[in-house]
């Protein structure tokens, strides 16, 4: 499978772009565990054009996480074009256009999934951005605005005609938000369309490597993107290593369009077997270290705490409430490290029934 100049092994797993989740520390760990492609948090085009520092900081990427995409969103054509040009200078391997975010503050203003109510504008933005940059441009969107407007089959053809290099489809409508079940049958229908010749990436409700394997088998997608199931669980990409799913070391980036050639063979993917709770705490501590080094102590801790709140490894620990509160209120690296080390000791002495 190939997106632009990026070649992947068979059945690659991608990390979905998620606000307040896919910071650099988390992306690097997902990459080490085998994510074939990672994405930054989504970036507001208008804020980027206005040089809002908190937005500009999201463009920070590392060669260790390649291939990496930067995702932008907005509803103004000129702002999206200018933002894409700014993003290109940051040196990602591709630019992704977000036409799928369902939250009110985005879709309610006509951006993200709001574009599903203004498809001519969506196509105009896509066409203009593709023409403005040299990098591959991809799109992430949903099945439609609601169940009465399931437009994805025709929309996929229209987006392909605009020149995009790949399309990611989340198997819900905007009206569903994240409720109900993702409908992969329509994703499979797009993939089977003989007119479609770009890679189709499926997304929605994948919680394990085994479920990803089933999606590949059943719907024939070119890649599977995993989102919420990765929260506090970057090792999900290292699970099911015998499933035939390709790992990050099996993909590479050719030196084209100003993008350096990166080898992933040096990235260590811990084994999925015998990967203990203590090992997983080591991963969370490593995430903390990277975030503090690459961002700063305050925001690095804030980003890491979000993953600590979501990680499944603390489920089932007796009398854990006060420890959780302390963990999520910690303000220094030393304080948070001490809490995690104390948890490690408790888990060693009193193992939980769940191994994360």
Question: What is the predicted role of each segment?
Answer:
Residues 2-14, 46-68, 101, 106-109, ...:
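N-terminal small/glycine-rich loop or linker at the start of catalytic domains
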Residues 18-20, 43-45, 73-75, 100-102, ...:
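Active-site beta-loop-alpha junctions enriched in small/polar residues
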Residues 81-95, 99-111, 120-198:
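Alpha/beta enzyme core
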């Amino acid at each position: 499978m190939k997106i632009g100049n990026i070649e992947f092994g068979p059945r690659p797993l991608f990390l979905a772009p998620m606000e307040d989740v896919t910071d650099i520390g988390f992306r690097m760990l997902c990459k080490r565990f085998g994510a074939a492609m990672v994405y930054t948090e989504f970036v507001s085009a208008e804020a980027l054009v206005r040089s809002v520092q908190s937005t500009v900081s999201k463009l920070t990427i590392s060669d260790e996480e390649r291939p990496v995409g930067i995702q932008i969103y907005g509803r103004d054509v000129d702002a999206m074009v200018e933002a894409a040009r700014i993003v290109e200078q940051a040196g990602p391997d591709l630019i992704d256009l977000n036409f799928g975010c369902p939250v009110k503050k985005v879709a309610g203003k006509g951006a993200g999934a709001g574009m599903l109510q203004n498809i001519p504008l969506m196509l105009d933005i896509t066409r203009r951005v593709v023409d403005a940059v040299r990098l591959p441009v991809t799109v992430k969107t949903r099945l439609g605005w609601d169940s009465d407007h399931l437009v994805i089959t025709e929309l996929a053809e229209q987006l392909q005609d605009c020149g995009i290099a790949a399309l990611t489809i989340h198997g819900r409508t905007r009206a569903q938000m994240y409720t109900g079940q993702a409908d992969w049958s329509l994703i499979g229908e797009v993939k089977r369309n003989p007119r479609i010749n770009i890679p189709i990436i499926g997304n929605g409700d994948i919680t394990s490597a085994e479920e990803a394997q089933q999606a590949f088998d059943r719907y024939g997608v070119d890649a599977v993107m995993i989102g919420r199931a990765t929260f506090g669980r970057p090792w999900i990409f290292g699970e099911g290593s015998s499933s035939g799913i390709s790992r990050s070391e099996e993909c590479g980036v050719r030196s084209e369009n100003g993008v350096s050639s990166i080898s992933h063979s040096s990235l260590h993917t811990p084994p999925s077997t015998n990967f203990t709770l203590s090992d997983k705490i080591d991963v969370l501590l490593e995430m903390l270290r990277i975030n503090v080094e690459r961002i700063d102590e305050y925001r690095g801790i804030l980003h890491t705490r979000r993953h600590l709140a979501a990680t499944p490894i603390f489920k089932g620990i007796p009398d854990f409430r006060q420890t959780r509160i302390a963990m999520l209120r910690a303000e220094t690296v030393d304080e948070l490290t001490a809490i995690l080390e104390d948890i490690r000791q408790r888990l060693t002495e009193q193992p939980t029934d769940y191994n994360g």
